[in-house]
């Protein structure tokens, strides 16, 4: 969805990559913490009046996709490097450097035949290049969790990679949107890639120029200018002054800041899920019917539309609604009467009232607002729910220690929608003590694949409600108004479908 805005909240978190298992990162207080103003649509689209499409980058910092700084380096890197697979708007893996893939009946051993591709120096892509990239990725904070269930990786021949898993996964290619660089060049500032552009320098500055070795379709621009910035704050200032023209950001991250001017905003659905966590050692949260009723009584649409300014999608299940197989039929609503009845059955009545607290990290104004709304929606004559705001470090420590009743959490799922870290006994993010061999088994069967397995899993999840998914966040791509038509960015690739983008540059059309 693209919107034309006169003002938009911009935030520090500029990363578009990284759909991996991890708890929400510690917030950055670089900017003040304030809610953005209401968005206003302009009455007419303004011409861009821009002669060169320009991207910001951090001069002197590596573009290596495994180790580079989150933000603008990753955005530029999306035009320099390619993965075996990229994810489309429905989170379905689409082959890029992979010619074909197959797996055994248990989805434990995967074989990937590589496309005949060439690095920008003219050398051929080999399975050893991919193997080297994956081995580094497996050791990294950014991508490591994707390879947690990998038993072995080997180059079967120059064009074939074999990966064996410790756990069946019929959707494993969805984890392989990891950019590939030429082995041995990862330690230079600009490692070699197979992407549509190459990094060049000239008297007029650094730029991306069309890669003559690239084997893809035609490009809308032969050259993309680069503007050096010292940090993310500078990138935002340069965007406000129209000296850079493309930013990827998190509009509901910690610390919002307003930038004026005619701006177009394209929302990009992500795999970042916000959810309500339960401590199952606390009454009445140890009652399955109460957890299920709580999940059903929450008005998720209001959370997204009113509190996140529409930058997200409501979801009651731990699968992004954009996924073509999202099981919407298993969503449900609980009436106030049904909620009160579930509480009464669990022993919570007006005569025997209870109080619960909901933890939220205090640095993020959007999350504080969501937490306040949840408390209002979950409070009844018999149950009082109040917010407890904590600094990030204390919030994380309280979760680890189990010192909470409820908490508002956020996690970036992988696009196979494996929720094992949240619901498996001993899972890294299972702070509430949920344990169900049956549901864990259903999750494993869901990963193996098949519509019947998916239906059994979401039905079992809805019945037990180990946690209550609330929404999946959207990121935002900003461009000056009137600069480009046909943008189709995805969470996996900010320049997805770039060949079909049309730029309106002053003095030319492309």
Which residues make up each language-model segment?
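Periplasmic-binding protein-like
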Residues: 281-323, 458-466
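Extracellular/periplasmic solute-recognition and catalytic clefts
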Residues: 154, 200-207, 225-282, 410
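Ligand/substrate-recognition segments at binding pockets and active sites
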Residues: 346-413
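Long beta-strand-rich cores associated with HINT superfamily self-processing modules
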Residues: 480-510
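N-terminal lobe/hinge region of extracytoplasmic solute-binding protein
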Residues: 56-105, 135, 192
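Structural transition elements
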Residues: 296, 312-346, 364-367
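Extracytoplasmic/peripheral linker and loop segments enriched in polar/acidic and small residues
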Residues: 386, 391-395, 420-483, 507-510
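Gly/Pro-rich hinge or "lid" segments in bacterial periplasmic/extracellular proteins
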Residues: 165-225, 231-234
């Amino acid at each position: 969805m693209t919107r034309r805005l006169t003002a938009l909240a911009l935030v520090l978190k500029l990363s578009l990559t990284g759909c991996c298992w991890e708890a929400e990162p510690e917030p950055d207080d670089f900017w003040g913490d304030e809610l953005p103003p209401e968005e206003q649509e302009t009455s007419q689209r303004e011409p861009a009046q821009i002669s060169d499409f320009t991207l910001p980058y951090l001069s002197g910092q590596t573009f290596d996709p495994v180790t580079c700084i989150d933000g603008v380096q990753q955005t530029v890197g999306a035009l320099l490097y390619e993965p075996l697979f990229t994810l489309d708007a429905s989170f379905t893996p689409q082959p890029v450097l992979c010619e074909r893939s197959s797996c055994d009946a248990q989805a434990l051993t995967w074989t990937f035949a590589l496309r005949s591709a060439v690095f920008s120096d003219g050398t051929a892509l080999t399975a050893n290049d991919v193997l080297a990239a994956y081995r580094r990725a497996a050791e990294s904070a950014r991508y490591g969790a994707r390879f947690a269930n990998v038993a072995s990786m080997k180059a079967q021949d120059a064009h074939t990679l074999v990966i064996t898993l410790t756990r069946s996964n019929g959707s494993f290619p969805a984890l392989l949107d990891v950019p590939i660089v030429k082995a041995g060049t990862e330690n230079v500032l600009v490692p070699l890639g197979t992407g549509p552009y190459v990094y060049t320098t000239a008297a007029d500055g650094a730029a991306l120029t069309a890669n003559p070795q690239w084997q893809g379709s035609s490009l809308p621009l032969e050259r993309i200018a680069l503007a050096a910035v010292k940090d993310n704050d500078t990138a935002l200032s340069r965007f406000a002054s129209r000296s850079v023209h493309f930013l990827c950001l998190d509009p509901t991250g910690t610390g919002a800041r307003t930038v004026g001017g005619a701006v177009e905003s394209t929302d990009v659905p992500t795999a970042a899920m916000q959810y309500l966590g339960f401590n199952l050692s606390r009454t009445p949260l140890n009652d399955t019917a109460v957890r299920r009723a709580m999940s059903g009584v929450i008005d998720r649409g209001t959370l997204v539309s009113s509190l996140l300014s529409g930058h997200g999608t409501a979801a009651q299940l731990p699968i992004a609604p954009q996924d073509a197989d999202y099981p919407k039929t298993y969503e449900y609503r609980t009436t106030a009467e049904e909620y009160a009845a579930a509480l009464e059955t669990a022993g919570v009545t007006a005569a025997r009232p209870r109080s619960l607290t909901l933890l939220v990290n205090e640095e993020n104004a959007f999350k504080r607002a969501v937490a306040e709304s949840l408390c209002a929606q979950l409070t009844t004559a018999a149950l009082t729910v109040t917010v407890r705001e904590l600094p990030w470090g204390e919030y994380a420590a309280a979760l680890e220690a189990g010192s909470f009743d409820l908490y508002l959490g956020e996690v970036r799922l992988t696009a196979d929608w494996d929720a094992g870290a949240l619901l498996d006994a001993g899972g890294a993010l299972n702070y509430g003590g949920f344990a169900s061999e049956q549901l864990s088994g259903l999750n494993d069967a869901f990963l193996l694949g098949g519509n019947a397995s998916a239906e059994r899993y979401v039905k079992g999840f809805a019945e037990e409600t180990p946690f209550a998914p609330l929404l999946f966040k959207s990121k935002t791509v900003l461009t000056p108004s009137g600069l480009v038509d046909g943008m189709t960015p995805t969470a996996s690739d900010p320049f997805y479908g770039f060949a079909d983008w049309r730029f309106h540059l002053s003095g030319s059309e492309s």
